[in-house]
Swiss-Prot record:
NAD(+) binds at G40, S41, G42, N43, W44, G45, F128, K151, A184, R309, Q338. This is Glycerol-3-phosphate dehydrogenase [NAD(+)] 2. It catalyses: sn-glycerol 3-phosphate + NAD(+) = dihydroxyacetone phosphate + NADH + H(+). It holds the Pfam family NAD_Gly3P_dh_C. Substrate binds at K151, R309, N310. Its EC number is 1.1.1.8. The lineage of its organism: Eukaryota, Fungi, Dikarya, Ascomycota, Saccharomycotina. GO terms for cellular component: cytosol; nucleus. One of its GO terms (biological process) is carbohydrate metabolic process. It is an enzyme of class 1 (oxidoreductase). Keywords: Cytoplasm, NAD, Oxidoreductase.
C-alpha cells in the first residue's frame, strides 16, 4: 500500500472514530441497584476499587453505594491492613498517600465480600486466581457477572485459555475484561487516561435495567479522569494485556544494557507483530483492529514498555545480574511483575504446540529469564521475525 493510501486510510479511521455518537453515558437505571465487589487490593486493585466506589456513590439509581474490596489480610506495624484502610481510608502499603472513598470497605473474608454481588471485579496476580475461584464456587449469586482486570493466561493440557473464560468455566458466570494504557499510580492520582472494557452480553441476558450490559459497565468504570470505551472483543484486549508484559521485559533488558530508545522501539515493533500473530493463531475470534484502535492495544504496549513493574524488574536484572524472582522481591514491595510468569506460560504453550520458532521475541525473553542466555544475544535471537501480513 502506498504511503498516501495508508495516510488516507488512517485519516478515514480517525474521522469515523471522532464522528461516532456515544450514547452510553445517557441516563441508565436499574430495577434493583447492582451491588459491586472487588477481589484484590494491590496497587491496581485498590485503584480500580477507588474508581468503582466513586461511581457507585454518585449513581444510587444504578448501584448500591457500598463496595466491598477483598483484602488478603496482613499486619502493618501490628495493625491489620483492613483496619487501616477502613479507618484512614488509605491503602498505606500498596497505594500510599491516595485517599479512598468512604463507601469502599476493606473486607478480609472473600466469601462475605462476593456472595451478594451482582458485579465482581477480579484484580489479583493471575497465579492466585485458581485458588480464589475454587473458594467462591457455589458461594456467589448464580446470575452474577464479572470483569477481569488480570493480565495473563491459564495454560493446561488442553491449551491456552483466557482468564475471563477460566472464570466463566469455573464459576458459571459471564466474565469480561478491562485493560488499557493504565499505570496505576497515574490513574489513582486522577491524571487523565483511557481504558477498554470488553464484554459479550450473554444468551441469558435478562434485559435492560435487569442485567449488566455495555451501558452499565461504562457507568461503573468511566470517570472524568478515566475514559472508558466498551467493546465486545474480550479475546483481543486479554491477549494484548497479557503479552505486552512479556514485551516490556524485553524493553527492560535493552534499557538496562544502556542500548537506548532505538533498541526499545525495535523490541516494541517485534512484540506487536508477535502479539497479533498469537491472537490470529490461537484466538481467531479476536479482532486485529483492537490492537490498533483501542487503549488496550498498542497504546497499552507503549505505556507498559515506557514504565511500570516489568520494565523496572528487567532493567534491574540487566544491571545487577540477579534473577527476576529476586529482583521482584527486592524492589516491588510485595507486588509482582506479571511478565515473568506469563513468559513461562507462553513458552510452555508454544513448546507443547510446536510453535516456539514462530515467536522469537517471546522465546528470547523466556530463555534470558529462565535459561541464563546472555541478554546481549537478544538482537540475534529476534532477527528472523516473520512479518505479520
Amino acid at each position: 500500500m502506498a504511503a498516501t493510501d495508508r495516510l488516507n486510510q488512517t485519516s478515514d479511521i480517525l474521522s469515523h472514530s471522532m464522528k461516532k455518537t456515544d450514547t452510553s453515558m445517557s441516563i441508565v437505571t436499574a430495577e434493583n441497584p447492582y451491588k459491586v465487589a472487588v477481589v484484590g487490593s494491590g496497587n491496581w486493585g485498590t485503584t480500580i476499587a477507588k474508581v468503582v466506589a466513586e461511581n457507585t456513590k454518585e449513581k444510587p439509581e444504578l448501584f448500591q453505594g457500598r463496595v466491598d474490596m477483598w483484602v488478603f489480610e496482613e499486619q502493618i506495624d501490628g495493625t491489620p491492613l483492613t483496619q487501616i484502610i477502613n479507618t484512614k481510608h488509605q491503602n498505606v502499603k500498596y497505594l500510599p498517600n491516595i485517599d479512598l472513598p468512604g463507601n469502599l470497605v476493606a473486607n478480609p473474608d472473600l466469601i462475605s465480600t462476593t456472595k451478594d454481588a451482582d458485579v465482581i471485579v477480579f484484580n489479583v496476580p493471575h497465579q492466585f486466581l485458581g485458588r480464589i475461584v475454587s473458594q467462591m464456587k457455589g458461594q456467589i449469586k448464580p446470575d452474577a457477572r464479572a470483569i477481569s482486570c488480570l493480565k495473563g493466561f491459564e495454560v493446561g493440557p488442553k491449551g491456552v485459555q483466557l482468564l475471563s473464560d477460566y472464570v466463566t468455566q469455573e464459576l458459571g458466570i459471564q466474565c469480561g475484561a478491562l485493560s488499557g494504557a493504565n499505570l496505576a499510580p497515574e490513574v489513582a492520582k486522577e491524571h487523565w487516561s483511557e481504558t477498554t472494557v470488553a464484554y459479550q452480553v450473554p444468551d441469558d441476558f435478562k434485559g435492560e435495567g435487569k442485567d449488566i450490559d455495555h451501558r452499565v459497565l461504562k457507568q461503573l468504570f468511566h470517570r472524568p479522569y478515566f475514559h472508558v470505551n466498551v467493546i465486545d472483543d474480550v479475546a483481543g484486549i486479554s491477549i494484548a494485556g497479557a503479552l505486552k508484559n512479556v514485551v516490556a521485559l524485553g524493553c527492560g533488558f535493552v534499557t538496562g544494557l544502556g542500548w537506548g530508545n532505538n533498541a526499545a522501539a525495535a523490541i516494541q515493533r517485534v512484540g506487536l507483530g508477535e502479539i497479533i500473530k498469537f491472537g490470529r493463531m490461537f484466538f481467531p475470534e479476536s479482532k486485529v483492529e483492537t490492537y490498533y484502535q483501542e487503549s488496550a492495544g498498542v497504546a497499552d504496549l507503549i505505556t507498559t514498555c515506557s514504565g511500570g513493574r516489568n520494565v523496572r524488574v528487567a532493567t534491574e536484572m540487566a544491571k545487577t545480574g540477579k534473577s527476576g524472582e529476586q529482583v521482584e522481591k527486592d524492589i516491588l514491595n510485595g507486588q509482582s511483575a506479571q511478565g515473568l510468569i506469563t513468559a513461562k506460560e507462553v513458552h510452555q504453550w508454544l513448546e507443547s504446540s510446536g510453535h516456539t520458532e514462530e515467536y522469537p521475541l517471546f522465546e528470547a525473553v523466556y530463555q534470558i529469564t529462565y535459561e541464563n542466555v546472555p541478554m546481549k544475544e537478544l538482537p540475534s535471537m529476534i532477527e528472523e521475525l516473520d512479518i505479520v501480513e
